């Protein structure tokens, strides 16, 4: 892969060459740019694209952190990118359509990790917008982590790519938040064409004003012009003239001298995968990516940078390649610095792939972990060293086997003394090479060995013989005293006497070793390792720092001196070959005499076979109504020679739960999905012999993941690493590896015995409810030498379980593996849901008829319902008949038919969909006689009188009951004008709030509201003395019904009555025309719940904001209480007070939100009780949960929960409890716990709001009065509490009202000292009256005083009326 560069050197090199050729090879309107363009850090680098028609290479646009207006940058000439397009972290770019309006083809000749289009972390990108992009000829797309990117679900990528299975589109803006609209759909004049994606038939477009281009079906795979005329077959993407290969926008195969051709003409060569060039052109291209200056080569009709694998240049003067003899040589070396010093793994990396080292090799590795395997990886291909080899002070080396291919040391340059192989002072070196498998020649020079205490002299002498240097060295060149003095160099051979194997254990014994002095033998060490091939040596993978590929076990000497030592090796893998050898541990030197050692030859032994592991990645797809295609991968551990697979399948019974539903109810039709084609059907079915027969015929289950999905999961972590390494100008902190999804759970028993079922009686009856409990038999087949099969003769649209077992050569004795299984459903059969027989009818009394029909004999799964379409000549009516009703009556009755001629047709609906309509049946309903009408009148008149009298009695009873309830003190139910409670018959009438549509401008989306999208915009003249005002604009979804539009406007009408600083204001309404708009005060910081969560310290983007202090919490509480006090004063019960329904302004003021806006966004905060609407149970008071009573007292309870949300930064109340548990917990008197670090003052206020008796809770005015001293000074200027509207009545008036309405508990102040039936005025706290404000009740009762209304506390033990806390400075 080519690496990008921020500079211009490679681009300039290409540019010099291409500039002269561009005019002759492409239309004169532009030029060919290459070899790839990298634009980063500075948006002005985009000017490099100004004249580009084709980018021959890649295009990177990345790491531009400064947001700019890109509208001034437009590159209409660019039509083709030959490799890939990559965009990453470009701030401010909202669409690619303006940048590249005519980009038509991305060829994908070279890919960015399998992708031709990558859009990654583009934070401001709103749409892709490449409306002229017609083809991505190779590779997939990856669009990931673009938080604001929409219009992804409206693009049909299958029209652009040949295959979409490898596309990766994850982490972008959720489609339901996008509101994607294709051109014309809002005006109900759609301009775009429709296609089907994931079973959704919808319009396809790039943006709100650009459709996705589709060619007529007559063109097939050919491109087309803008006028939908078919292009020449050699054109790709588009063309200017039909059937003309000289006017193509891009070529399907190759471009040569203005013409698109299927192959390059003789004398020309393919270049960069898309055009033809001659030999002179290829010879003059500088190789910008090669370390030498040999230029490009010609091979197999293509002009390329380097010879392909297995080929080498014929000579340095030739442009042609010839096959290598063996591995292709790679010469390394520096003419100036002839000695290559290897002192670390890093320096060894420079020799990776080298086969010939021109110069000398000096190895000086003093330390390092796992050094041997690393050196072998980087130096293992070296065959020839032209100079000398010197190994000194390399204490980390045990062996030189890492130079596994070294065969020749030329010695053209030698050390002083004519040494060409020099080994000095290597304290742990024990082996040079395995001379049984090594041929090494030292052509010139001598060898020198000194101070290698563990290297036996015999090893050095053996090298003399193999390398042909014997006789060259003098006596002092190989020092026998300081080489091998610490090693057991003269070894006896230990011989194994017995071996016994199991599947995971080996027992070995060997002859007893007897040194001259038994005391010199200390113990034995057994070495063993996995050895797939019989080519291991004792020193493989060893270094002096402890790395060793061998496992070691110490064996003590047997107590009996005559006994044979042995060892049990356990924890081994089944059916695995192991290499084992034994070494005696002896004293190496006693009084300067060498002690003979002992070790065995390497023994190769294989463990026994065992049951295989389960097959992997079982997938199934259906290609017809009677077949399932099954594919899997071999087991990870065959534990033997894998011989065959057992495939077993079982039809699953229908889900009885489905049968209990009445599918005539709305939204009851289940998801219909069969096992769609997730694997290559042609590949599986190419051999009909793999089919197996026999079988039988259940509800949809989750489909198994496709191969593409699994591959995408595997590649994700690796892709991220490659991608982040590529962006070398940025610093990344890699995320922890994502865990792979667990494999399917399988049975924990092996299949040691099997019964083969070949036939089964078909007793299935769709009308029999017992079939829901049926246990169907398994069928079985053996599959040899393949990991796929086709199961035939299955029932249509039926669920099957398919088990796959692995079996190896020992299956007859050990059994097969446990199963891996998959569930799959066959496709529906055409016509299976049609009603087979004629529809008959019988007349019934009272203008009714009874229709009868037979059920489908073998439907697609379960019959859910029948639909009857009947009518006279005027209009058809429809009647739904549930399956249960049909089974009960054998048909359906049509009632209250008017006299006349009728036709009726019937259609069955199964799990897979609808059947065909039956042929019409004709019937006649006669008119009633006069006598019948008279009798009906006689019967109906008394019934009507009884119904009227009964209705009056019920009304009187309800009125009396309601009046008595109001006297019991259980709360007053105010008539609420909440927008959920209004008559749908109300019709909105424009008034002075109407705003002209042209005064409104929408800018950006804010979020989804109850009725539709909410936008930020600008309104002109809606606020006095402000020419323009930033506003929030609420809209209605285009699919909304008339009722919903009326609800939307009437909700706005409620807001017209409110004029309070702490309630979000309505600014205007646009009701004329479509869409309907409601203009609200803009609350830039969103809802209080989101705002509080953004203050959490762990939030990623919270770099400035800090959690609120106590004074800020009290300020929020006071502002919310002031807004609620205003609503209470206007006889409005909110019913849904919560942090999500409060809004935060630019100056951090908290206001009561416009009602209903957040109900969709926080849908999980609501709970549907029984068949009722959604209820916010976690914020509701006990009386509201029990009786559905909503009063200002219940709003106070909710206010206490809001205080708890403020203190916890918007945690969910009653965390850990389900909605049903919360409902019971609150009704039984449970309360929220005190939040961590919550000030006592705030928690006491919460507890006061959560008094079980509604009358014991303070009013909102009392709450404000208790904390008014803590509020900011501006609160007095803007609040309802201090306004003239809240001026309290005179004491005489209040006392008179109390005497006149003693049962009105709403007006009774909560005075703890009240103990008599008379209700005198409470005293003002400290005898003072608030300035510019009402008198305030401050509840400071002593707990020793008698508590009021103690009998009304719901029977809760030790319940006390908590006083409102005294405010204090934070």
UniProtKB/Swiss-Prot annotation:
GO terms for cellular component: alphav-beta3 integrin-IGF-1-IGF1R complex; axon; caveola; glutamatergic synapse; insulin receptor complex; intracellular membrane-bounded organelle; membrane; neuronal cell body. This is Insulin-like growth factor 1 receptor. It catalyses: L-tyrosyl-[protein] + ATP = O-phospho-L-tyrosyl-[protein] + ADP + H(+). Gene3D superfamilies: Hormone Receptor, Insulin-like Growth Factor Receptor 1, Chain A, domain 2, Immunoglobulins, Phosphorylase Kinase, domain 1, Receptor L-domain, Transferase(Phosphotransferase) domain 1. The keyword Phosphoprotein applies. Autophosphorylated on tyrosine residues in response to ligand binding. Autophosphorylation occurs in trans, i.e. one subunit of the dimeric receptor phosphorylates tyrosine residues on the other subunit. Autophosphorylation occurs in a sequential manner; Tyr-1166 is predominantly phosphorylated first, followed by phosphorylation of Tyr-1162 and Tyr-1167. While every single phosphorylation increases kinase activity, all three tyrosine residues in the kinase activation loop (Tyr-1162, Tyr-1166 and Tyr-1167) have to be phosphorylated for optimal activity. Polyubiquitinated at Lys-1169 and Lys-1172 through both 'Lys-48' and 'Lys-29' linkages, promoting receptor endocytosis and subsequent degradation by the proteasome. Ubiquitination is facilitated by pre-existing phosphorylation. It comes from Rattus norvegicus (Rat). There is a cross-link at residues 1169, 1172 (Glycyl lysine isopeptide (Lys-Gly) (interchain with G-Cter in ubiquitin)).
């Amino acid at each position: 892969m080519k690496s990008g560069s921020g500079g211009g050197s490679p681009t300039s090199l290409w540019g010099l060459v291409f500039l002269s050729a561009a005019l002759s090879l492409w239309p004169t309107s532009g030029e060919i740019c290459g070899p790839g363009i990298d634009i980063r850090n500075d948006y002005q680098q985009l000017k490099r694209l100004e004249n580009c028609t084709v980018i021959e290479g890649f295009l990177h646009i990345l790491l531009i952190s400064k947001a700019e207006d890109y509208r001034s940058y437009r590159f209409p000439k660019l039509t083709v990118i030959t490799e890939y397009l990559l965009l990453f972290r470009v701030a401010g770019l909202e669409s690619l359509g303006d940048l590249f309006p005519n980009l038509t083809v991305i060829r994908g000749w070279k890919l960015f990790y399998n992708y031709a289009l990558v859009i990654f972390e583009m934070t401001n990108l709103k749409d892709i917008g490449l409306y002229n992009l017609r083809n991505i000829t190779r590779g997939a797309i990856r669009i990931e982590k673009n938080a604001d990117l929409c219009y992804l679900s409206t693009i049909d990528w299958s029209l652009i790519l040949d295959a979409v299975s490898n596309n990766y589109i994850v982490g972008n803006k959720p489609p339901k938040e996008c509101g994607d609209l294709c051109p014309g759909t809002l005006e109900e004049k759609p301009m775009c064409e429709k296609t089907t994606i994931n079973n959704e038939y919808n319009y396809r477009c790039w943006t709100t004003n650009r459709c996705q281009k589709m060619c007529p079906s007559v063109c097939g795979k050919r491109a087309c012009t803008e006028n939908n005329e078919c292009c020449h077959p050699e054109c790709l993407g588009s063309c200017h003239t039909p059937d003309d290969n000289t006017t193509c926008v891009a070529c399907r195969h190759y471009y040569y001298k203005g013409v698109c051709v299927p192959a390059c003409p003789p004398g020309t060569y393919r270049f960069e995968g898309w055009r033809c060039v001659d030999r002179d052109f290829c010879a003059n291209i500088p190789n910008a990516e090669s370390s030498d200056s040999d230029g490009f080569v010609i091979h197999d009709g293509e002009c390329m940078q380097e010879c392909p694998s297995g080929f080498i240049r014929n000579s340095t003067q030739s442009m042609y390649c010839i096959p290598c003899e063996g591995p292709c040589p790679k010469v390394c070396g520096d003419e100036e610095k002839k000695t290559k010093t290897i002192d670390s793994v890093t320096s060894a990396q420079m020799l990776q792939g080298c086969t010939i080292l021109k110069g000398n090799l000096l190895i000086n590795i003093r330390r390092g972990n796992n050094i041997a395997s690393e050196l072998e990886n980087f130096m293992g291909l070296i065959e020839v060293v032209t100079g000398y080899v010197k190994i000194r002070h390399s204490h980390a080396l045990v062996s030189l086997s890492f130079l596994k291919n070294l065969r020749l040391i030329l010695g053209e340059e030698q050390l002083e003394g004519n040494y060409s192989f020099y080994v000095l002072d290597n304290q742990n070196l024990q082996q040079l090479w395995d001379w049984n498998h090594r041929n090494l020649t030292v052509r010139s020079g001598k060898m020198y060995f000194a101070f290698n205490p563990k290297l036996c002299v015999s090893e050095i002498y053996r090298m003399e013989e193999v390398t042909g240097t014997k006789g060259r060295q003098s006596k002092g060149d190989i020092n026998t005293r300081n080489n091998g003095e610490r090693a057991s160099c003269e070894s006896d051979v230990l011989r194994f006497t017995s071996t016994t194997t199991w599947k995971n254990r080996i027992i070995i014994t060997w002859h007893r070793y007897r040194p001259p002095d038994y005391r010199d033998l200390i113990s034995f060490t057994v070495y063993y390792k996995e050895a797939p091939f019989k080519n291991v040596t004792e020193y493989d993978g060893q270094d002096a720092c402890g790395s060793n590929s061998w496992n070691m076990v110490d064996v003590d000497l047997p107590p009996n001196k005559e006994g044979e030592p042995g060892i049990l090796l356990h924890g081994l893998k089944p059916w695995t070959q192991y290499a084992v050898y034994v070494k005696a541990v002896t004293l190496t030197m006693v009084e300067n005499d060498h002690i003979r050692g002992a070790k065995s030859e390497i023994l190769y032994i294989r463990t026994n076979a065992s049951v295989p592991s389960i097959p992997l990645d079982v997938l199934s797809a259906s290609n017809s109504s009677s077949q399932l295609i099954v594919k899997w991968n071999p087991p990870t551990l065959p534990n033997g020679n894998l011989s065959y697979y057992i495939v077993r399948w079982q039809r699953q019974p229908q889900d009885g739960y489905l049968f209990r539903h009445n599918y005539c109810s709305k939204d009851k039709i289940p998801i219909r999905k069969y096992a769609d084609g997730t694997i290559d059907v042609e590949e599986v079915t190419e051999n009909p012999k793999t089919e197996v027969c026999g079988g039988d015929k259940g509800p949809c289950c989750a489909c198994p993941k496709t191969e593409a999905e699994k591959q995408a999961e595997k590649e994700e972590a690796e892709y991220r690493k490659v991608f982040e390494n590529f962006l070398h100008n940025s610093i990344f902190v890699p995320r922890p590896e994502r865990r792979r999804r667990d494999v399917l759970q399988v049975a924990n028993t092996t299949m040691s015995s099997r019964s083969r079922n070949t036939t089964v009686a078909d007793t299935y009856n769709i009308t029999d409810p017992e079939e829901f409990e049926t246990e169907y038999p398994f069928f079985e087949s053996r599959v040899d030498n393949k990991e796929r099969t086709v199961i035939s003769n299955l029932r249509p649209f039926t669920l099957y379980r398919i088990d796959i077992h692995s079996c190896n050569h020992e299956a007859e004795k050990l059994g097969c593996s446990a199963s891996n299984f998959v569930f799959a459903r066959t496709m529906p059969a055409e016509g299976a849901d049609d009603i087979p027989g004629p529809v008959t009818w019988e007349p019934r009394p009272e203008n009714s008829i009874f229709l009868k029909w037979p059920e489908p004999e073998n439907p697609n799964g379960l019959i859910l319902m029948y639909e009857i379409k009947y009518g006279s000549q005027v209009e058809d009516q429809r009647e739904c008949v549930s399956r249960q009703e049909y089974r009960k009556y054998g048909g359906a009755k049509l009632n209250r038919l008017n006299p006349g001629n009728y036709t009726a047709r019937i259609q069955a609906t199964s799990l897979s969909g609808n059947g065909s309509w039956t042929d019409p049946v004709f019937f006649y309903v006669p008119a009633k006689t006069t006598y019948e009408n008279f009798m009906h009148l006689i019967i109906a008149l008394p019934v009507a009188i009884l119904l009227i009298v009964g209705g009056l009695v019920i009304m009187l009873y309800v009125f009396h009951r309601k009046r008595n309830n109001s006297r019991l003190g259980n709360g007053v139910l105010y008539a609420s004008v909440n927008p959920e409670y209004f008559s749908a018959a109300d019709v909105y009438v424009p008034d002075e709030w109407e705003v002209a549509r042209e005064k409104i401008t929408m800018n950006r989306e804010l979020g989804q509201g109850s009725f539709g999208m909410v936008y930020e915009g600008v309104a002109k003249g809606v606020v006095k003395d402000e020419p323009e005002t930033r506003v929030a604009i609420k809209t209605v979804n285009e699919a909304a019904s008339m009722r919903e539009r009326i609800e939307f406007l009437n909700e706005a009408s409620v807001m017209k009555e409110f004029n309070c600083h702490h309630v979000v204001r309505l600014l205007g309404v646009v009701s004329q025309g479509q869409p309907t708009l409601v203009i609200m005060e803009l609350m830039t910081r969103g809802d209080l719940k989101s705002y509080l969560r953004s203050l959490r310290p762990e939030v990623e983007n919270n770099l400035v904001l800090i959690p609120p202090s106590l004074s800020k919490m009290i300020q929020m509480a006071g502002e919310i209480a002031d807004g609620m006090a205003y609503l209470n004063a206007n006889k409005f019960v909110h019913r849904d007070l919560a942090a999500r329904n409060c809004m935060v302004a630019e100056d951090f003021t908290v206001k009561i939100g416009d009602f209903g806006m957040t109900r969709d966004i926080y849908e999980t905060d609501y709970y549907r009780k029984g068949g009722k609407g959604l209820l916010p149970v976690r914020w509701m008071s006990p009386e509201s949960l029990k009786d559905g009573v909503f009063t200002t007292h219940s709003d106070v309870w909710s206010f206490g929960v809001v205080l708890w949300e403020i203190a916890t930064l918007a945690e969910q109340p009653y965390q850990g409890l389900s909605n049903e548990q919360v409902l019971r917990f609150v009704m039984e008197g449970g309360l929220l716990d005190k939040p961590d670090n919550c000030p006592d003052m705030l928690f006491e206020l919460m507890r006061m709001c959560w008094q079980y008796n509604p009358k014991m809770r303070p009013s909102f005015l009392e709450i404000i009065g208790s904390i008014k001293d803590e509020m900011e000074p501006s609160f007095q200027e803007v609040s309802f509490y201090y306004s003239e509207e809240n001026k309290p009545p005179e004491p005489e008036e209040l006392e008179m009202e109390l005497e006149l309405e003693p049962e009105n508990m709403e007006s009774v102040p909560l005075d703890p000292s009240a103990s008599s039936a008379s209700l005198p005025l409470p005293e003002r706290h400290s005898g003072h009256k608030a300035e510019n404000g009402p008198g305030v009740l401050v509840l400071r009762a002593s707990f020793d005083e008698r508590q009021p209304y103690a009998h009304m506390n719901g029977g809760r033990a030790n319940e006390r009326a908590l006083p409102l806390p005294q405010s204090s400075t934070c």
